[in-house]
């Protein structure tokens, strides 16, 4: 007992000097964890960092394709000072993404495991005091098939804004989203992992200096889609209090809207399993090793589009599904009924979402920048698996976006805008309007800046490509070298906006450009240099696509009635 008291006295003394000599130890409901202190250049306040804290049992054996279960308790002091393994995924794609997106000075070497349900915590709190700082829980992107927690260092955001940052991992790909669309494997396992992590935060974050009554979930791309799903899910009620969806929401056709059962059969067949019944497929796939499932995953070529085969037979991603549990009914119904979590909500897109990085990842044949309408129509149809645009709609879409030019380079740019609108712009506005109409505070932004850290291969004129805002949100200029004063100030402003929103449900604050609420006037903020308010983001595009889809639905139901007669 006296040893514990002595340790506590010395820890208090060290912390008061700002240079702790003893590593931080914190109690969780499962056992004690030992972390490390990190200091950001220019700040005396150290950040206590805990890497690889388990929030659930390893999802192995019978827990593959099953909801996560709470972690087993431990009786020793668990060292949580090194990054956890990433969830199983394509290692080459993971490395490519980390190189492009990370705010770290150098890439953290990757290890992969099915045992991957861990989270990282960055807390600037004095752990000897009863601090109650706002908590920001990050859900990474990567198309629900790649990436992990080690891409994001939470120290700059934690120390600049005095918030507790938590970065979670969740099952990906086949492991995270395999669905037979019935009780044998409902799917959405990765989203259920996210819910489990939020339960862990509620139970434990107070001991890390965080306030469990002030939790903001935020995520980008598939992480933004995940945030959007959690906003709709009754399972996540009261687990968070604000939400930020960056560059994707539930209606992104890449990640939601396709039948999962044909994909399940294809996966099972590639694994050498019988596909006669759901039970047979699930039982067989549970017997496969991690490496055998990875081999199947690589054969499926997730994260790329097949521009040669039948697009209706191609599955570039494993989708979020309506499972009756996480999503009890269709998102459209949940939004119409206003039966979702009406927390303050920030939704945003980047100016050129489909500018360079996603076409490159998906192998779009656009490198020559020489496009004509016929080729554009062909590419749109081949991209059906990620866009869900039927052949009937393609001529109208091509005419609307490309009809005003004959120049191949301009046509290419407009074509990229078309796809960006389908995947990101239009769904984001639709979700924001639904949230606003339910009476919840809503804010929108469009990010319009080219970070200095992006690849030299990218066209110079491209401002606000997919994921560009990550460098500002995560304080990359304070970890990487070469940022200008302008870029440093932009990052400070963006971190302040995000943290203000986490604190108050409103991004505005002293010394910041005014960010209008997204009300009936549809004000939003253009984030760039300078940042300025504007109105009606993508409203004409939303009108066009809403009308076009409604016409198609009406024709389909009229045809169905005719057939029935």
From Swiss-Prot:
Induction: Up-regulated in liver upon feeding a diet enriched in cholestyramine or cholate. Its EC number is 3.1.1.1, 3.1.1.13. Gene3D superfamilies: alpha/beta hydrolase. It comes from the Eukaryota. GO terms for biological process: cholesterol metabolic process; chylomicron assembly; negative regulation of cholesterol storage; positive regulation of cholesterol efflux; positive regulation of cholesterol metabolic process; regulation of bile acid biosynthetic process; regulation of bile acid secretion; regulation of chylomicron remnant clearance. Disulfide bonds join 87-116, 273-284. Glycans are attached at residues 388, 489. The keyword Glycoprotein applies. SUPFAM superfamilies: alpha/beta-Hydrolases. It is an enzyme of class 3 (hydrolase). The modification Phosphoserine is found at residue 378. Belongs to the type-B carboxylesterase/lipase family. This is Liver carboxylesterase 1. It comes from Mus musculus. The lineage of its organism: Eukaryota, Metazoa, Chordata, Craniata, Vertebrata.
């Amino acid at each position: 007992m006296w040893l514990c008291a002595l340790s506590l006295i010395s820890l208090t003394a060290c912390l008061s000097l700002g240079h702790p000599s003893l590593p931080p130890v914190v109690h969780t409901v499962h056992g004690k964890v030992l972390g490390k202190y990190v200091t950001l250049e220019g700040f005396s306040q150290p950040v206590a960092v805990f890497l690889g804290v388990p929030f659930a049992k390893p999802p192995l054996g019978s827990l593959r394709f099953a909801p996560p279960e709470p972690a087993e308790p431990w009786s020793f002091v668990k060292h949580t000072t090194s990054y956890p393994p990433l969830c199983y995924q394509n290692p080459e794609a993971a490395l490519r993404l980390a190189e492009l997106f990370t705010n770290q000075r150098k890439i953290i070497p990757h290890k992969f495991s099915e045992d991957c349900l861990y989270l990282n915590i960055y807390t600037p709190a004095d752990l000897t005091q009863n601090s109650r700082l706002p908590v920001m829980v990050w859900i990474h992107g990567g198309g629900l098939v790649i990436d992990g927690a080690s891409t994001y260092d939470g120290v700059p955001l934690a120390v600049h804004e005095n918030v507790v940052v938590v970065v979670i991992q969740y099952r990906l790909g086949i492991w995270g989203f395999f669905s037979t669309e019935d009780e044998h494997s409902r799917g959405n396992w990765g989203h259920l992992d996210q819910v489990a992590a939020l339960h862990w935060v509620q139970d434990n974050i107070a001991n890390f200096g965080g306030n469990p009554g002030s939790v903001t979930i935020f995520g980008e791309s598939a992480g933004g889609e995940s945030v959007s799903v959690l906003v709709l899910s009754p399972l996540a009620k009261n687990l968070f209090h604000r939400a930020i969806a960056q560059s994707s929401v539930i209606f992104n056709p890449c990640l939601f809207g396709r039948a999962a059962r044909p994909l399940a059969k294809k996966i099972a067949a590639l694994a050498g399993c019988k596909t006669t019944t759901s039970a047979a497929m699930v039982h067989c796939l549970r017997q496969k090793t991690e490496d055998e499932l990875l081999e199947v995953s690589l054969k499926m070529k997730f994260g790329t589009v097949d521009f040669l085969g039948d697009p209706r037979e191609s599955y570039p991603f494993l989708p979020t599904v309506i499972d009756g549990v996480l999503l009890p009914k269709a998102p459209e119904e949940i939004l119409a009924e206003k039966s979702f979590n009406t927390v303050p909500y920030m939704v945003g897109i980047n100016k050129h979402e489909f500018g360079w990085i996603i076409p490159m990842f998906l192998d779009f044949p656009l490198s020559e920048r020489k496009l004509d309408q016929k080729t554009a129509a062909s590419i749109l149809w081949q991209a059906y698996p990620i866009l869900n645009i039927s052949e009937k709609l393609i001529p109208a879409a091509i005419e609307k976006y490309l009809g005003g030019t004959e120049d191949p380079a301009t046509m290419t740019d407009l074509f990229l805008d078309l796809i960006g609108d389908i995947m990101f712009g239009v769904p984001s506005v639709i979700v924001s309007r639904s949230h606003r109409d339910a009476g919840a505070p809503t804010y929108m932004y469009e990010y319009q800046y080219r970070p200095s850290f992006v690849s030299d291969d990218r066209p110079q004129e491209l401002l606000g490509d997919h994921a560009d805002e990550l460098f500002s949100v995560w304080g990359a200029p304070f970890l990487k070298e070469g940022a200008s004063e302008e870029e440093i100030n932009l990052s400070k402003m963006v971190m302040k906006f995000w943290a203000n929103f986490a604190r108050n449900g409103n991004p505005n604050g002293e010394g910041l450009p005014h960010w209008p609420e997204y009300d009936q006037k549809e004000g939003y903020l253009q984030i760039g240099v300078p940042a300025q308010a504007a109105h009606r983001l993508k409203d004409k595009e939303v009108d066009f696509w809403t009308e076009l889809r409604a016409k198609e639905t009406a024709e389909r139901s009229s045809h169905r009635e005719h057939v029935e007669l």
